């Protein structure tokens, strides 16, 4: 019975599959169709027919190198804006090493570098398989076939404007690995898994950042693949504890780290990918949280994790680090992010004070001293809330409180040049007041990036 049924169907319909090769993005929808309902009832009948099913096999268009653009003078012309800097290099730290450094007299030598790692007491330290930069390999065309479009899509016509900056984002702690290589010293993310275990959290889906995806050595492979699928913007963060292993002003700059990020930026530009640089993405050097996982156990008053922003040395140290990086790369980087989601690491009132003032100092350094023509901003992590029930007065009040506390704390001074909102001053008792001069200096130094929205019905 099954065989005869199949034969009957084959006799009624014949089909042909045709593949059409093309490349590049789909044309945006014209959005001219108007939906009109109809009361006409369909009629059905049977007949023989044939059809051709055409499927477009679309391949991505690689990013194309763009004309040479500069956004400020080269470092050779800007070095006078920085204090006298010494540069050096360090080896790797290996807990299983059988020999120990002998340069104990050097406060910033290999022995001092190793001592920072020993004091960190990281557990289950592991190392990746790479120890040098891997040369990129081309991506086969067969791997660049774009998935077919969805059959069922939203009725509305949505498309990005031509100047919309769509790209890929990463963080050093999430992708680099090589955490103890070429002079990098411990940073807050190195202790996250250990900290989670210490408070009884489920760590089954967590991994230490010791290896990650080994982007530190595979960055050329990664950028080659981003460019191959047409990505035009790559946002990454430079690891502070690589550039300045001892974190604070007056300590040596790691010339290997500068060379690494210099090459990363140059290679991205060569491939037609514009670099977007973040100065810190939760990876505060461990010195600001006490040097080990214990510092993470401090319960923040407003944020989610102690990232050392409240440390009295943080502001000047971060500005010093930021100036070094900006002065070296401002001629090739058009977009700078000082902090990624600053609210996450807010511990106390001084945390907020140090964040907004160090950001503003770097903004003015870039605009007024470097004469940069790019953009400087912060990536906000707190999404604006909406009332769950728009007509409910308590939901509206809760929404205003949430937005004022989590967003207005930064936007009031940095975007509007205004004082902190009452919700912040009433919640954080040790907040640092802003003078009129502070508000004027902070004003208009912030752009905003929101990933989502929140619905609010209770005060938090």
Describe the residue ranges of each PLM region:
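Catalytic domains of carbohydrate-active enzymes, especially glycoside hydrolases
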Residues: 164, 217-239, 264, 274, ...
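Aromatic- and Gly/Pro-rich amphipathic surface segment
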Residues: 187-224
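Surface-exposed beta-strand-to-loop junctions
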Residues: 200-201, 235, 344-347
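Fungal secretory targeting signals
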Residues: 1-17
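Active-site region of glycoside hydrolase catalytic domains
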Residues: 16-163, 167-170, 174-196, 248, ...
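Chitinase-like catalytic core of GlcNAc-active glycosidases
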Residues: 202, 212-215, 240, 246, ...
